[in-house]
């Protein structure tokens, strides 16, 4: 439910329907099969509701995986990019999240998110011999054809026409602090800005740093990003900061949580529909048992030169 008719919610992009409505969330199917001791196949298929009770089928991931050892684990196919922490920790599963939705910055591009969240190519990850420091790496090379609907005009899409990307990341999971992860990543590709012309290209660089702690019933997630769009042929360059911080603590069956997110997208960039927006989310999740839960979340989003958005989301989640 929203306090205005525009079907936009600052933390999710937009939702189907009008100011207050019911809608079916994602139906996520995860299929895995071992081929040999080291080779396997993974696929993730999501059925999501569109407008007017129509449904879309998304092949979120399909991977041929080969784990040579703990230091070299390869995946070939369609994957969720390892930009930061959230995208590869929660994937498409609403069940896995404490909140009803992903931070807008980390939302999938087809739901209005800013990042190239999916790609086709090769991903390699593994541990680095580092003793108690627990270092791990990730390296990816592939194509991410990002098409995102604009938040203020959902029927209008922004096709970034991405070139091949490279993404590298490093993170530590020290033995002396179970549940702690500290790391970062660097992503680069080239994209198009068709609003400025059919041949306008720019370099896109995304730098991430994150600190995560998940232990003793506590979930603390904090990620900061710098998105840089550098136009070719002596064009402008835009540096756009963004972050989110989320904290929750489980008490028996209930997990109250708080999240604050911030995005400062340059209005002259391809993210002119996003602009400057920030605000808190408050909520709680109640798990009836290990397979059924319900969530309630209140969002307040401040937007530059636009009215504030207030939203209430209620969500039933289950796993089987």
Identify the meaning behind each predicted range.
Residues 9, 19, 104, 150-151, ...:
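General secondary-structure edge motif
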Residues 140-157, 193-194:
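Active-site-proximal beta-alpha loop/turn segments in soluble metabolic enzymes
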Residues 113, 159, 236:
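Glycine- and other small-residue-rich loops at beta-strand/loop junctions that grip anionic moieties
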Residues 15-17, 108-111, 154-157, 197:
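Short, P/G- and charge-enriched loop/turn segments at secondary-structure junctions
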Residues 1-3, 17-146, 162-166, 171-177, ...:
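Outer membrane beta-barrel
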Residues 1-12:
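Transmembrane beta-strand segments of Gram-negative outer membrane beta-barrel proteins
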Residues 154-164, 308, 314-315:
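Hydrophobic secondary-structure block in the mid-to-C-terminal portion of proteins
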């Amino acid at each position: 439910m929203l306090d205005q008719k525009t079907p936009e919610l600052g933390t999710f992009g937009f939702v189907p329907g009008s100011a207050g409505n019911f809608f079916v969330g994602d139906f996520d199917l995860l299929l895995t099969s071992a081929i040999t001791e080291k080779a396997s196949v993974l696929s993730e298929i999501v059925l999501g509701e569109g407008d007017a009770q129509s449904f879309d089928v998304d092949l979120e991931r399909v991977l041929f995986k080969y784990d040579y050892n703990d230091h070299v684990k390869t995946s070939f196919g369609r994957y969720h990019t390892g930009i930061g922490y959230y995208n590869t920790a929660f994937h498409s599963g609403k069940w896995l999240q404490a909140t009803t939705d992903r931070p807008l910055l980390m939302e999938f591009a087809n739901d209005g998110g800013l990042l190239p969240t999916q790609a086709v190519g090769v991903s390699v990850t593994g541990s680095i011999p580092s003793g108690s420091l627990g270092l791990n790496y990730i390296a990816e090379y592939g194509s991410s054809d990002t098409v995102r609907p604009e938040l203020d005009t959902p029927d209008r899409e922004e096709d970034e026409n991405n070139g091949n990307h490279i993404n590298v990341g490093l993170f530590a999971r020290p033995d002396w602090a179970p549940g702690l992860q500290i790391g970062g990543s660097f992503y680069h590709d080239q994209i198009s800005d068709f609003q400025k012309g059919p041949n306008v290209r720019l370099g896109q660089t995304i730098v991430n740093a994150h600190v995560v702690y998940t232990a003793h019933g506590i979930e603390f997630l904090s990620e900061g990003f710098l998105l840089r769009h550098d136009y070719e042929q002596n064009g402008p360059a835009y540096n756009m900061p963004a972050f989110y911080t989320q904290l929750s603590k489980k008490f028996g069956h209930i997990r109250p949580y708080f999240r604050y997110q911030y995005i400062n997208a340059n209005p002259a960039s391809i993210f002119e529909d996003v602009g400057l927006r920030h605000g808190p989310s408050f909520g709680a999740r109640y798990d009836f048992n290990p397979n059924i839960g319900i969530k309630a979340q209140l969002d307040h989003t401040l937007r530059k030169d636009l009215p504030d958005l207030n939203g209430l989301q209620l969500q039933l989640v289950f796993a089987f």
